[in-house]
Amino acid sequence: MTNQKQTTHFGFKSVDWNEKEKKVAEVFHSVAKNYDRMNDLMSLGIHHLWKRYTIELSHVRPGQSVLDLAGGSGDLTRLLSQKVGDSGQVILADINAAMLHVGRDRLLDEGLFKNIRYVQGNAQCLPFADNSFHCITMGFGLRNVTDKDEALQSMYRVCKPGGKLMVLEFSTPVFPGLKPVYDWYSFNILPKIGKFVANDEASYQYLAESIRMHPDQETLKAMIERVGFEDCHYHNLSGGIVALHIAYKY
């Protein structure tokens, strides 16, 4: 870690730097079983459109190597595996063992195994060689990382020259009038859905808080460029509720 005596945020709470990783792990161990169902309910299924849009802009080709970081239950990995074909490879990496097992079991049940590997690893110190991947995707995971700068540096290291980084993450609404409605939904409805469906209100309260604490579009763009990626730009989806940042390593 950058500074083990430092504090950071866990939702709206201030916690010890080393404590956040443990608390986030507890959240995702708790939500893993109901993760897909909750995503569908919370977004009314729109998260599938955001992910398909990400894959469309990836321009991943057969034979390429792709890292799906914080790949969770495997939505992006499934789509990427179809793009790279049997001659390519997708590595689904996640720090959380419970989420990794959910993703692996789900994709195996769908008959997807020829070109997919599973790795449990920390985004801040990725266990891969330099210049390994043509494309790195990270869907709804960066806001949970303790040291985002360190994670982005690690992604830059393992990205091939000419490769691409794609970060799909909740962001700051830009559509006029959307933010107060979104805030009301996030803090009044999401935790109740979590309590009703998964008997876990606290984890979804953290979800809402973690979104508010995540850097906005321009701040994240600057962070990505600061570690060495170039030509970073972003697409606001659903009025900025979600943003897709794309950047390149030259």
UniProtKB/Swiss-Prot annotation:
Catalytic activity field: a 2-demethylmenaquinol + S-adenosyl-L-methionine = a menaquinol + S-adenosyl-L-homocysteine + H(+); a 2-methoxy-6-(all-trans-polyprenyl)benzene-1,4-diol + S-adenosyl-L-methionine = a 5-methoxy-2-methyl-3-(all-trans-polyprenyl)benzene-1,4-diol + S-adenosyl-L-homocysteine + H(+)
Residues the record lists as binding S-adenosyl-L-methionine? S73, D94, N122, A123
EC numbers on record = 2.1.1.163, 2.1.1.201
Q: What InterPro entries does the entry give?
A: SAM-dependent_MTases_sf, UbiE/COQ5_MeTrFase, UbiE/COQ5_MeTrFase_CS
* Pathway where it operates: Quinol/quinone metabolism; menaquinone biosynthesis; menaquinol from 1,4-dihydroxy-2-naphthoate: step 2/2; Cofactor biosynthesis; ubiquinone biosynthesis
A single Gene Ontology biological process assigned to it is:
menaquinone biosynthetic process
Q: Which UniProt keywords apply?
A: Menaquinone biosynthesis, Methyltransferase, S-adenosyl-L-methionine, Transferase, Ubiquinone biosynthesis
Q: Which family does it belong to?
A: Belongs to the class I-like SAM-binding methyltransferase superfamily. MenG/UbiE family.
Q: What does this protein do?
A: Methyltransferase required for the conversion of demethylmenaquinol (DMKH2) to menaquinol (MKH2) and the conversion of 2-polyprenyl-6-methoxy-1,4-benzoquinol (DDMQH2) to 2-polyprenyl-3-methyl-6-methoxy-1,4-benzoquinol (DMQH2).
* UniProt protein name: Ubiquinone/menaquinone biosynthesis C-methyltransferase UbiE
- Gene source species: Legionella pneumophila (strain Lens)
Gene symbol? ubiE
